[in-house]
């Protein structure tokens, strides 16, 4: 009962956060296609490292256990040496480093669980992975906001830019258009104000790896499901052919 209650509360929080972001993105920019390849183990491993180092400080992934990372090629020892910061057992779930009470005091609400965030963000504009990929690449400095940051996909976002050291400071460039007496601001691109530790290409790749991992984390069995699904379709095709030929042989003399 407790587990089911926890699942329901987490999904409600995630969906509520997603609904807010969807409304905020209504007048925003088109979503970029995320480079999702859930069979790319190197990408998944790097994404897991970024997730633990940056996301797990405030967010949890309460329905994901560290030992499940064996599915992406990491041994228990590698997980212990490089990814265990909030617990000392690989069988534990991925809990946030921050105390929930502190998180609520600082942000006004507990940061949502990220286990299935890549699935809950899906909408008409693109997949959940597309949303996350664009969202994490469209932060910019805004001194009028409490956190000092804003976002093109999610205007007035409450979460600060946790990857800012990697990306650096950027400023969006808008072009003013007038139509039927109404002026609108159209996003044209970015101006790099302060360089980060990574080049734009390296940052995009890192975010792509992170989103790839989050897409895999939302359904760790998806690669197995797809692989088994191919064999099931092949079996059904062969079985259908055999059944058709057998049926023809049975009814040949009757006809």
Model-derived features with residue positions:
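Sec/Tat signal peptide C-region and signal peptidase I cleavage site
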Residues: 3, 18-24
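Electrostatic cytochrome c docking/interface patches
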Residues: 25-49, 60-71, 79, 218-226
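Juxtamembrane amphipathic/hinge helix adjacent to a transmembrane helix
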Residues: 200-224, 228
């Amino acid at each position: 009962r407790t587990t089911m209650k926890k699942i329901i509360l987490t999904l409600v929080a995630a969906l509520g956060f997603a609904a807010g972001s969807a409304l905020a993105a209504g007048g925003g920019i088109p979503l970029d296609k995320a480079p999702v390849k859930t069979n790319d183990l190197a990408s998944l491993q790097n994404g897991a490292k970024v997730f633990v180092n940056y996301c797990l400080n405030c967010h949890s992934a309460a329905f994901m256990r560290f030992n499940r990372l064996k599915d992406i090629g990491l041994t228990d020892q590698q997980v212990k040496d490089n990814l265990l910061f909030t617990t000392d057992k690989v069988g534990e779930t991925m809990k946030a480093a921050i105390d929930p009470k502190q998180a609520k005091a600082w942000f006004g609400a507990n940061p949502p669980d990220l286990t299935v965030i890549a699935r809950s963000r899906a909408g008409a504009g693109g997949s959940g992975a597309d949303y996350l990929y664009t969202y994490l690449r469209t932060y910019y400095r805004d001194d009028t906001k409490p956190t000092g940051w804003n976002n093109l996909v999610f205007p007035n976002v409450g979460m600060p830019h946790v990857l800012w050291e990697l990306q650096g400071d950027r400023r969006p460039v808008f072009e003013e258009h007038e139509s039927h007496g109404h002026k609108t601001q159209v996003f044209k691109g970015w101006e790099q104000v302060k360089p980060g530790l990574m080049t734009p290409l390296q940052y995009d790749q890192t975010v792509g790896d992170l989103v790839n991992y989050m897409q895999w984390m939302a359904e760790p069995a998806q690669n197995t499901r797809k692989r088994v699904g191919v064999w099931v379709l092949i079996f059904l095709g062969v079985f259908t052919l055999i059944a058709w030929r057998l049926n023809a042989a049975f009814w040949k003399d009757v006809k």
